[in-house]
UniProtKB/Swiss-Prot annotation:
The lineage of its organism: Eukaryota, Viridiplantae, Streptophyta, Embryophyta, Tracheophyta. PROSITE patterns: B3. GO terms for molecular function: DNA binding. It holds the Pfam family B3. Residues 225-273 are annotated as: Disordered. It is found in: Nucleus. This is Putative B3 domain-containing protein At5g58280.
Length: 273
């Protein structure tokens, strides 16, 4: 019974398939599809041809671009700079003026700034900042110590003044939410030719005014700048006298200790004898 049912089902499917094919071929859409010729599209023509809506043949316009050669001297550099993002393309000073400070130069400048601050004996708040390349060559964003800013500045953007050792004042913009100097700092850095490794002593002499002292990584430069600053960097006579007294006292103590040692040795020898 099941076999007869399966055979009848297969016969019915075959009849339906034949009927569907005969009806589909008779449709006009199928006849149009059969008559259509598919030609391969040339991709080279599509790449070079510009899209046009007009069916009119375009008139050929003569061009003199190939006959004239204009050398501006900057085209190659501009093309190269578009694809290169090296640090040298963003610096604001000549490349031969930019230096890479050594560890010894950075430490020497930082210690010179701290020593000068101790000799000032100023009651004003201060901090020492060591310069890096982004501070003085390219980015010109100077981040300040967060604790110093929280203690002395409000959390808002305001204008402050930067005074150098010669008394010249520069206007700058302090951004409180980022605790740093932005506008105006670039001019100060370029005018004073600050380099990588320089140490700057920032002294807040007024609520919105910094007195800035520059210390170079080169020791000779620090010596010449110290002479310009005057007696502020050299110890006073009282300090020199105190140092001499300390040296004399230490020498007397050493001499007395040696004398006591000698006397004790002599006593031991006498007792043994």
């Amino acid at each position: 019974m099941a076999m007869a049912y399966e055979e009848a089902r297969k016969l019915r499917l075959q009849e339906n398939h034949k009927r569907f094919q005969s009806n589909f071929v008779a449709l006009p859409q199928f006849q149009l599809l059969q008559q259509r010729n598919h030609k391969p599209i040339d991709k080279a023509l599509l790449a070079t041809a510009e899209p046009r809506r007009s069916s009119r043949v375009r008139t050929v316009i003569s061009s003199y671009r190939d006959d004239v050669v204009v050398d501006t001297g900057r085209t190659s550099n501009l093309r190269r700079s578009r694809h290169s993002s090296t640090w040298a393309t963003y610096i604001s000073r000549p490349l031969h003026e930019c230096k890479f400070a050594s560890y010894e130069e950075k430490v020497g400048a930082f210690k010179a700034a701290e020593k000068f601050q101790r000799s000032l004996k100023s009651p004003h708040p201060y901090f020492v900042k060591s310069m890096v390349r982004s501070h003085v060559y390219s980015c010109f964003w100077l981040g300040l110590p967060s604790r110093f800013c929280a203690d002395n500045f409000p959390e808002e953007t305001m204008e402050i003044e930067l005074e150098d050792e010669e008394g010249e004042v520069y206007e700058a913009v302090y951004i409180g939410r980022r605790a740093g100097l932005s506008g105006g700092w670039k001019r100060f850095a370029l005018d004073h030719k600050l380099d990588d490794g320089d140490a700057l002593l920032f002294e807040l002499v007024e609520p919105k005014k910094f007195k800035i002292y520059v210390f170079k990584g080169n020791e000779n430069a620090n010596l010449t700048s110290a002479r310009k600053r005057g007696r502020a960097t050299t110890p006073s006579e009282e300090e020199e006298e105190e140092e001499d007294k300390d040296v004399e006292e230490s020498g007397d103590e050493e001499h007395s200790s040696r004398a006591t040692k000698r006397s004790s040795v002599r006593l031991l020898r006498k007792r043994k004898a």
